[in-house]
Amino acid sequence: MSEHNSDIVHPPTKDCITRLKREFQEISKNPIENILVTPSPSNILEWHYVILGASNTPYEGGVYYGQLIFKYNYPLSPPSILMTTPSGRFETQKRLCLSISDYHPESWSPSWSTSSILLGLLSFMSDNEVTAGSIVTTNDEKRILATKSMDFNKKNKTFCELFPYLAMDE
């Protein structure tokens, strides 16, 4: 289990498991452009995502890996959102302060889904708003990190296990 999951003592509720399984089926049927996502094989509360840097952005060509850590009672509570790969936009392995994250449970809506969370994260990544967990860098610094992102990710065992088709050498 992830060290970031504060609900280790609480197994996920039946509703939580049902909802997360349904959301994964939906994402599998209707993938999100520039985002890959999969639950951990050993923990339904821990999802792993990859954001593929969009063309004509400082992130172009980058591969950004991170985690969504759901609470045992999701969708009643929002997940933690973490970024593992240095992007020049977010601190690594720090909870991100977004209205769709556990930083702001008061603004969370149970109608939001994993897809909407990931789309919100992608949108926020392209923005320059400063918040807890974000950092300020130049576009040139972001471009340099984009070129180094895959080498960084290949050193991460979990990334390589969950996204082997990305981790393979070309």
Curated annotation (Swiss-Prot):
Its EC number is 2.3.2.23. Pfam families: UQ_con. SMART domains: UBCc (SM00212). InterPro entries: Ub_conjugating_enzyme, UBQ-conjugat_E2_core, UBQ-conjugating_enzyme/RWD. GO terms for molecular function: ATP binding; ubiquitin conjugating enzyme activity. SUPFAM superfamilies: UBC-like (SSF54495). Gene3D superfamilies: Ubiquitin Conjugating Enzyme. Pathway: Protein modification; protein ubiquitination. Keywords: ATP-binding, Nucleotide-binding, Transferase, Ubl conjugation pathway. Residues 15-165 form the UBC core domain. GO terms for cellular component: endoplasmic reticulum; nucleus. It catalyses: S-ubiquitinyl-[E1 ubiquitin-activating enzyme]-L-cysteine + [E2 ubiquitin-conjugating enzyme]-L-cysteine = [E1 ubiquitin-activating enzyme]-L-cysteine + S-ubiquitinyl-[E2 ubiquitin-conjugating enzyme]-L-cysteine. The active site is at C97 (glycyl thioester intermediate). One of its GO terms (biological process) is protein polyubiquitination. Belongs to the ubiquitin-conjugating enzyme family. Catalyzes the covalent attachment of ubiquitin to other proteins. This is Ubiquitin-conjugating enzyme E2 J2-like. It comes from Dictyostelium discoideum (Social amoeba).
